């Protein structure tokens, strides 16, 4: 089968690789000059199935109000003047109940755990290298309230049989020796030994090369204007003056997926702006061994070979990609507070990206009401974590195979209601 994939981020490239392995003739189209040059370029570097959790959680609405008055708040909201933003936020608020949180987190952990298994199999099969580490992830708590609040996450981990360790301040330094100097600032930590880290952009670039060796064609610097429709199906992709035709089409355009298919269906994927800095390591002993997540500021600090990546935060501000100095200040403050002297933040590069977020946190992967159109988008902050599993899942669906995990609640159909001649978002 001929398959066209729109988007060459980590999710699009993973989809291409697994589809090619399944024997399909695959073409990837992207407006950028190469793979992983937008959202996948400089993310936090975590592959963390155990920490897969929706931003829509109990208590978040009240926290959001409090964060409005904090200098280093992990969340910021600025109205972008669109009705869609307001609808999306209302839908997110409706997912902030304990019941919805448990359902959504369960879905996310299921896909994320499967994705890590797929990544490990890929690594064993190909030997792909991407500055990866398998030292686990460590969530750091600065208050007793945060430590107590981890109970609901631990319950989900136990239900999903995800290994974890609850660490005291004294035990934190066994996982991350450099934290010994600041253990008095911490009340404890939740360690997930099965999690991993790695450079997402490097991984995507090398996976694209592997996909090319399987026959995948990459068309970069190519405009993606519209989908051509005929007889209720996709007849091609309009790319400038050319129409590219295939048997099946995959939209993996991240935050831009929503507008691109808006004439066909309304999907609630909104850009969640995040930031990162990447600093050279100056003292390896003072740098992290693997990765930590500061629960207070929602910031991840990840060790690559000779660099430290510090990333996180969320801004609901539309497609604004302005680099804000205050956000860099927060990232520098966090890493210098926990790992003083580990990296030279004065020489750090500063980046921002738009994560494609759904109101319930779960991505949209699978079939659509249009028979030959598939979606692989909406992964939020977990595109790197969920990429391989999402790609394999999509390849199975397009190939007519039964997926290895439950997939019906991951598709767009959970958001759509039938209406005469159309589909629309289930906001009501």
Curated annotation (Swiss-Prot):
Keyword Oxidoreductase in record: yes
Broad class of enzyme this protein falls into: oxidoreductase
Keywords: FAD, Flavoprotein, Oxidoreductase
Cofactors that this protein relies on: FAD
Role according to the record: Oxidative deamination of D-amino acids.
Record's catalysed reaction(s): a D-alpha-amino acid + A + H2O = a 2-oxocarboxylate + AH2 + NH4(+)
Binding site for FAD: 3-17
GO molecular function, one term: D-amino-acid dehydrogenase activity
EC number: 1.4.99.-
Name the UniProt record assigns to this protein: D-amino acid dehydrogenase
Pathway noted in the entry: Amino-acid degradation; D-alanine degradation; NH(3) and pyruvate from D-alanine: step 1/1
InterPro entries in alphabetical order: DadA (IPR023080), FAD-dep_OxRdtase (IPR006076), FAD/NAD-bd_sf (IPR036188)
An individual GO BP term: D-alanine catabolic process
Keyword RNA-binding: no
Family stated for the protein in its record: Belongs to the DadA oxidoreductase family.
GO cellular component: cytoplasm; plasma membrane
